[in-house]
């Protein structure tokens, strides 16, 4: 989520100023995050005016400002257009390639399975099945209870 009363730059600065001391380091990191997440063009825009994809990129950029080892992304592919979905998937792949652990919860099973190493299908509050994406897709119980036969 983002601070709704702040613009894009202020949202990221709010996190950076808590973790970094030097102004030049803060500015350098801010510029890198804006660039890496493709949101330089909206840096002065109020966070409430962002599209779904822009907001999602800002949320992840804010998270990265804290230099985490792991991130939890709650429905990162929800409510965004197909182009933005691909952008977010690429960003998630980039996080993974930079050795940042990523835990995703999302109902967009098809897109999510394309970017994860392992998946857990939860049905009625319990783990129905866990495994690699191809194991999930080919599991008869997962097909019957969650994916449907035409997945």
Question: Which residues make up each language-model segment?
Answer:
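Q-loop/switch helix immediately C-terminal to the Walker
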Residues: 5-17
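Conserved ABC ATPase "signature" region
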Residues: 13, 24-42, 93, 141
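Conserved ABC ATPase signature
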Residues: 46-50, 54
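Hydrophobic anchor residue at the start of the ABC signature
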Residues: 60
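Conserved catalytic motifs of ABC-family nucleotide-binding domains
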Residues: 67
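Catalytic Walker B motif of ABC-type/P-loop ATPase nucleotide-binding domains
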Residues: 71-75
